[in-house]
Amino acid sequence: MAAVLRSLRRRDVASATFSAYRSLTGSTKPAYVAQKWSCLARPFSSRPAGNDVIGIDLGTTNSCVSVMEGKNPKVIENSEGARTTPSVVAFNQKGELLVGTPAKRQAVTNPTNTVFGTKRLIGRRFDDPQTQKEMKMVPFKIVKAPNGDAWVEANGQQYSPSQIGAFVLTKMKETAEAYLGKSVSKAVITVPAYFNDAQRQATKDAGRIAGLDVQRIINEPTAAALSYGMNNKEGLIAVFDLGGGTFDVSILEISNGVFEVKATNGDTFLGGEDFDNALLDFLVNEFKRTESIDLSKDRLALQRLREAAEKAKIELSSTSQTEINLPFITADASGAKHLNITLTRSKFEALVNHLIERTKAPCKSCLKDANVSIKDVDEVLLVGGMTRVPKVQEVVLNIFGKSPSKGVNPDEAVAMGAAIQGGILRGDVKELLLLDVTPLSLGIETLGGIFTRLINRNTTIPTKKSQVFSTAADNQTQVGIKVLQGEREMASDNKMLGEFDLVGIPPAPRGLPQIEVTFDIDANGIVTVSAKDKSTGKEQQITIRSSGGLSEDEIEKMVKEAELHAQKDQERKTLIDIRNSADTTIYSIEKSLGEYREKIPSETAKEIEDAVSDLRKAMSGDNVDEIKSKLDAANKAVSKIGEHMSGGSSGGSSAGGSQGGGDQAPEAEYEEVKK
């Protein structure tokens, strides 16, 4: 027995086995278990408050979080050890929320309740042609919200894209908190440069729902340029950003620490998801041609095909061909069917060529708007996972006439740039200044349905612009102001951001009243519009929310739901931890009982076995208090082995060992017991 006790003493005190050892020495209430439980019960909010501003790249496919360490940004690894986190959210059969890799792993078996790529829906209307196109490509439901926005449905419940984004942001926030060891409440979040006002506002709402004070919304290409330019690099830079769901191109001038965006352009519905979908269509059609079976209606098969398409796309960036092998993809009367296709890089490039071609026009427009020629561009930065595709790099070379730089990590540069912007806002980084632009023209609808611009695209922000308008009819006492964003000449062809009325205008002949309309764009690119009757001084002002968008009440409700999810997650973690602790304790007790059964009375052994049985039964339930109670009871029961041995019942202990089996029997006495 001496050898047994010595080996127990050598074990890691942090293991739950130690509680069994403490029981053997006669402690009726193991301090370790109590301490572990109190640790589990401690809420997340006990972290000391920090004032770090984290940088988050909220991506369509993957997200990334970074923080400034001294003068340099550091990308933080998540709980799975990865530097990027899949922007995937799932609700399993128990209604539990899964985010990131765990959500992506179960997508094949739970396709209708696994939501991904919602960044493409954020700030969009349900009737938008792009939304309708997306609906045909995803296995989950996209539904029309009461306000007309596009929302998603999972487990019978509807969620706004901002909410789904908030679940991902919460994961990034927790990743940063685990690394920093303190709570985080401030963030800089990136968005595609070509996002309109509604999309920017919806992204800011997502941050609020996640419990973050969004200090700044920053454009992704600008963030990447910040990351690149940290090391005193200067010149005219083109940033080509092709990500999972969006495409942006920006021209920036870096000089003496000033990052000035000259122009930006893009396509908010072009990215890796479209490449996957093109490959998915090919696989479905190929299987239909060879097997005469249409897989497009089989959600489970489609999800397997989607995963295979994404994997093949990644592999073809470094190899010339790949095998797509999916056994038992479906079955018919003749039996199981398997999909086996060899895909070459040239075939893949042919399938996606029309998508790559779509990047050319925005690049040319951007160069034109910036008033620079190709030869003026000193360097081209590639950002976004899709820029690893060799054909994309070839097109970039053709557009800009020079090989793109590998100076930044395509997956991490944006988050690092966001962290740098956080450092600038906090005052830690003093030598850098960022001057960004508004991507789209802003204006109002005037007589005849004309779009009258007040602020042209690529105007440096923040900015403010006023213009005087008048009434279109005699004795008009109110005017409706329709706020629009876009580049088309007719108001109806542009994106309507919102509308409001200026009332109480004194009756007068048309053209006489003077109504001053002012547009104010802040550094986030978010618009405030005011209209003022110059004769009365009456003013009406709104911060633009699209006719959809989330109301304050809805945001508050979603914040509460997010807190509830966090509470449920904590309860689930507590349950798992206490079950693990109980499982380890059972193993230790049974091992001890096996070793000492013959040296203790049978009724003591029976009592221990019953306590273990009760603990096992409690473990199968979800009542944490019940498991804790049975765990304490089991530890108390097994302590009787120690009491019995120290009480001299085995006949081999010294006189000192017969002192009533006190709580803390000296260890030396046990070593005198012979087996």
UniProtKB/Swiss-Prot annotation:
It comes from the Eukaryota. GO terms for molecular function: ATP binding; ATP-dependent protein folding chaperone; unfolded protein binding. GO terms for cellular component: mitochondrion. Residues 1-51 form a transit peptide. Residues 666-675 have a biased composition (Acidic residues). Residues 648-663 have a biased composition (Gly residues). Residues 638-675 are annotated as: Disordered. It is found in: Mitochondrion. NCBIfam families: PRK00290.1, PRK05183.1, prok_dnaK. Belongs to the heat shock protein 70 family. This is Heat shock 70 kDa protein, mitochondrial.
